[in-house]
């Protein structure tokens, strides 16, 4: 199980999905599956599959508001996203 969670973080789309949730939450925005799907240019079904895996890894929580699921990072997910952001910053500043 641990191995699968680590592999999940190194998939490009999964990383893009996680960081989309992170950046949107920084702006105080609620994040929905359909929004993520359009932002990362992936099918709704694929985004939902990745979100479920993030949920199993306790990186996100899904909250139902009416018929819409809102996706939020857990503390663990927030810490992981912040570390990834630090790596991105290092790579972007390495010129």
UniProtKB/Swiss-Prot annotation:
InterPro entries: WH-like_DNA-bd_sf, WH_DNA-bd_sf. This is Uncharacterized protein AF_1382. It comes from Archaeoglobus fulgidus (strain ATCC 49558 / DSM 4304 / JCM 9628 / NBRC 100126 / VC-16).
